[in-house]
Amino acid sequence: MQRALVSFSMLIAFASVSSAQTSKNAKEPLVEFENMTWAEVKQALADGKTTALFYTGGTEQRGPQNTNGGHTFMGRATVKAIALKLGNAIAMPVLPYTPNNASATLPGTIGLTNELLTAILERVSEQAITTGFKNVILMGDHGGGQPTVYADVAKRLDEKYAPQGIHVFYCDSVYAPAQDDFEKELEAKGYPRSNHAGIFDTSEMMYVCGDACVRKDLIKTAVGDPVLGPGEQRDPNAPRVNNGITGDARRSSADIGKQLFDKRIEYATREIRRFLGMQP
């Protein structure tokens, strides 16, 4: 396990160097840990930026129209925006791998196990605490069973460090709650149902990184297998599209992506402020 953690630390460092999310605007506060010097981190802590924001991205196939690093690209933009809006936080490097399984049919996914993610989250959280952060926030760009991992790690570490006045929280509203509410808004406007690599993922990637991560010429044919509602089962006689898309992404746009992105930031900052006892 220790060797695995060391290997992933090296991978994360490599990913950080290649990050396109840099603070180029001189007037914008430095909030990305990987783009700061140790002296700048120390000063930020002294100035009250004592909340560390950890966000997990992921390397996963996202249909023929989206690049495999979409979770990570969106994660970098999201966690930076949250840090800027909070004003008392630092965005830590985004983890580019999360629990998943590779496939030769749809090659694009490189995944961890839940056990390894647990170990990594515990390690980086405690490293942030050693660095001087008083609050650690865990967030992820995934649904499924992964939120349980974040919640369990946060609960365990919070119980361990609370006697020292240090807290660890899991912020879940940034992903499913924000997306579910936005999905209802779109459906009310006549947009088709969508899920993985559908209108939400594609639109948000168009807003965050545009041509760098979305093949816009393929959006017009970006339709996959249908989204199943609660209790629905797939028709065994219906042909499978199996192109990595669930739903319909053909009406994707950067404008829709911005609306979803802004909702994520709104939901996350509201929940984190509640954790920290700040005014909403």
What are these regions (language model features)?
Residues 21-101, 105-115, 119-137, 141-280:
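Extended, histidine- and acidic-residue-enriched regions that form the cofactor-binding/catalytic faces
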Residues 1-4:
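Positively charged n-region of N-terminal signal peptides that target proteins for export
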Residues 7-16:
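Bacterial N-terminal signal peptides
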